Amino acid sequence: MSTSDKHNTPQMAAITLLGLLLVASTIEIAGAQSIGVCYGMLGNNLPNHWEVIQLYKSRNIGRLRLYDPNHGALQALKGSNIEVMLGLPNSDVKHIASGMEHARWWVQKNVKDFWPDVKIKYIAVGNEISPVTGTSYLTSFLTPAMVNIYKAIGEAGLGNNIKVSTSVDMTLIGNSYPPSQGSFRNDARWFTDPIVGFLRDTRAPLLVNIYPYFSYSGNPGQISLPYSLFTAPNVVVQDGSRQYRNLFDAMLDSVYAALERSGGASVGIVVSESGWPSAGAFGATYDNAATYLRNLIQHAKEGSPRKPGPIETYIFAMFDENNKNPELEKHFGLFSPNKQPKYNLNFGVSGGVWDSSVETNATASLISEM
């Protein structure tokens, strides 16, 4: 080895180490980017919008769901590079369905006025509208509202940037066991089939709220806690060649099967809500919530037996919201209203915060020895 090679050895080691650290960080962060967090605002003690968006950024949370086009939040999101699922609330669905002029106005005021400074990725038209719940009065308006918003987005020149969909829950699934036999309820097919057709034709994903907690708490005699928390040591459900060790995958794949049976085999799924309450009802404990959330973040990188690969997933919710009811709805937050984390979660960063000082100090130490 030449003299110059000897002198360059520490420097090369530092550069090599820095490169490895950056690659490791990039891999971890890339995996974590499957995860977003829902920003609910039903609390009287929550931080202001600017503080909230700074919290998202500091915790490396790269995706956010808004339930309505709150202009304060949208202003705070400008330049943040956070991808946004923007909600068109149920209260606006009938109005938007009634005419294109209303859809154009909504898109102009809530989308185009903020684009491209705010990275809006989806418009979620309505949340959990269903013919079998208290929102049944809106069912006939949902697909027309989606169509009008889609057309308005296209007219605004954003059709290649923003997908239009709706967020549904599991009440629309008639059969979910085994997952391969998943299907939409027969008495709801008149409602779901047009939605599936719209999503297929526009190449947009279905947004699905998936909560193993509610399945477990409603039927603890047949659904085990480990199966619900991603901690089952063995296969719980054998479905042909597919093996299920957690309820989240089983629920997700039952929706994929339902889509396929409805002519939507090409339609993807984004998990628009999932979480676990830390108090307020049976099974709602701090330990259970921490376990579920930690495992969900990890599992979102991997995919389900039917659809391997990262699952775009939004955790519900950013904060505990004290104006929600019933009691357990107040306890889904990742953070307390004072911005203190309730759990030690990793969004691709150390302890929930990407602490680059570890890499910087390690590199500086090597360079100082040159």
UniProtKB/Swiss-Prot annotation:
* Keyword Hydrolase applies: yes
Propiece residue ranges:
349-370
What the record says about the induction of its expression is: By ethylene and salicylic acid.
Which residues are tagged as glycosylated in the record?
Answer: N361
Annotated active site residues, numbered on this chain, are E128 (proton donor), E273 (nucleophile)
What does the function comment of this entry state? Implicated in the defense of plants against pathogens.
Q: Which family does it belong to?
A: Belongs to the glycosyl hydrolase 17 family.
Name-wise, this protein is: Glucan endo-1,3-beta-glucosidase, basic vacuolar isoform GLB
Q: Which organism is it from?
A: Nicotiana tabacum (Common tobacco)
